[in-house]
Amino acid sequence: MSLTTATKSFGPVRAVDGLTLTVPRGQALALLGPNGAGKSTAIALLLGLIPPDSGRAALFGLAPERAVRQGRVGAMTQEGGLVQRVTVRELLSFVSGTYPAPLPLDEVVALARIGDLLGRRVDRLSGGQAQRVRFAMAVCGDPDLVVLDEPTAALDVEARREFWTGLRGLADQGKTILFSTHYLEEADEQADRIVVLGHGRVIADGTSAEIKRAAALTTVRVTVDGDASWLATLPGVRHMEIRAGRAHLRSGDSDATVMALAHAGAVRDLEVVPADLEDAFVALTSTAPPTVPAPVAATALTTTPAGKENA
């Protein structure tokens, strides 16, 4: 699937600004960004729900609407409604009947883990149960591409864990998966690749490890006797805080910082804490200005698995 220099505005607000994004088949991609970054608009463009003002969207080399009609795409959007006053089984049977080659119902039920809900009326589902049914509807057609917009927003911790178990089952079958989420640990654990949007543009694109290395700082913690102000001048150190007698050094080159500390010999209880995805996300989204190119170049981080063609 791909977006090519896609632009979309709503009145004076440019939600997507010249966005280019290509996803190979079989990849699980997480789309991240703060509120208003353009995630939902980008997904709507890919699905053909709204047309771009300029640029192009394509799924499997086809116009999105055509790929959707062929049953190659399953989507779970934030606003997806459910038919009321029918049972879950009746709803899924109806949805399956709209596809030329649907996934067997027992497989849908197993993937979504909704076996205990089949006899329940849709209008009596909890928010989390309704989300699981929406996921089941998204995979009824045995799609090649599954698009999920904030899929675990209404789920508790255990339900989220079960959801991702089911989704990884799809990924293991070679399905392409695109999801947006505010739970950064989900992106860290589940995505082969992460794209961070800001002001409708790509500001970072790569694996979780690549983005963390490129965008975030490692924390070096030490206990030092006496005046600690000199620690701020060590190689790599960009920020220092003293908390409860320990210095917390935010370093862009932790190896150089640690070597300098070891050479000084005046420190103890040395601890190096690698950056996590949340650190990188905050660094990227708090510094990316709306009108200049991204500080972390997508071309420098993008990794496309060998031999994979685009979805």
Put a short name on every predicted segment.
Residues 47, 55-69:
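Conserved ABC transporter NBD signature motif
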Residues 157-159, 182:
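Helix N-cap at the start of a conserved alpha-helix in ABC-type nucleotide-binding domains
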Residues 164-251:
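ABC transporter nucleotide-binding domain
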Residues 146-150:
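Catalytic Walker B motif of ABC-type/P-loop ATPase nucleotide-binding domains
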Residues 93, 97, 103-118:
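Conserved ABC ATPase "signature" region
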Residues 216-288, 311:
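Short, charged/small-residue-rich alpha-helical element at the C-terminal edge
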